[in-house]
Amino acid sequence: MSKINHQPSEAELEILQILWDDQPLTVREIHEIISQTKNVGYTTVLKQMQRMEAEKGLLIRYKEGKVHYYSAAIQKSDVQTSSLNRFVNAVFNGSTSDLIMHALGNQTTSKEELEELEKWLKEQKGKL
């Protein structure tokens, strides 16, 4: 797992999610996808992506002819792990069990989900 040096903002995560689903893409393609759900200008998306590439190292850009393509420079799983660790540390004082119990206590958990969780716990115990 690589170390995430910059925790992506909500807007950056939106762009990364699009790229993780289908990359490489151009700014225009990403703008078209984002524009389906919110009113944002092309130049806003362009500037955001330029900063993500040049300043934050979140994107990789390459040129093919006159077209610039972008790909995510970080793995989705690395961002998920980093974000979850920060959340658990900040909100649950580092306690993963508190997080899980809180999540299960606030949701309607199906029998299948509980069985999956039991299976996962047994696998984790076997790794100790």
Mark where each language-model region is.
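Short, cationic-aromatic polyanion-contact patches
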Residues: N5-S9, K63-S82
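Beta-hairpin "wing" of winged helix-turn-helix
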Residues: A54-E64
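Short, hydrophobic-biased segments on the C-terminal half of alpha helices
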Residues: L46-Q50
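Short alpha-helical segments that sit at the start of domains
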Residues: M1-L16, D78, K127
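Short helix-capping/hinge SLiMs at alpha-helix to coil transitions
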Residues: I18-Q23, Q36
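Short helix-coil junctions and helix-kink-helix linkers
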Residues: E32-V40
